[in-house]
Amino acid sequence: MKPVTARKRSGTGATVNQMELRPENSEHLQLIRAYEAGSVQIGESFYASSFLLAPARSPVEWQVEQFSQINESDFAEILTLSWDVLLVGTGDQHYLPDLRLQRMLARAGRGIDFMSSRSACATYNLLALDGRAVAAAIILPLRASAVTGR
């Protein structure tokens, strides 16, 4: 939301500053509209498997089912994209990569943050709406217990 200019309230003798909020024009951005345990809505489409996302690019499937399986080749495609910050949603919990993967990603010379997939979805939208060069690699499901029925 973008602030609109303050207004002067008349008739009371006092000056009151009001801020009116209007939605930003985000039609051209690929944004996450909703998420639940087993799926994420981007625009009008729902995704039930892991995906890669950038504001100016349609989501593509990411062949990662759980963070423990992740390896260097899983980042090959996303490292070719233009971004300053990569958010890696690690699934239902927050995990950090092993030392080998950390070294490989450090060589990319760009910011990479690991967080739960739910947090990555929310953070992605904030950065995209702020005009940041962001990309996201989201592992689904967001919450294992909801998917398995526990």
Predicted segments, located by residue:
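Short acidic loop-to-helix transition motifs that present clustered carboxylates
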Residues: S117-A122
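Short active-site-adjacent helix-start/loop capping segments
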Residues: V60-W62, H94-P97, T123
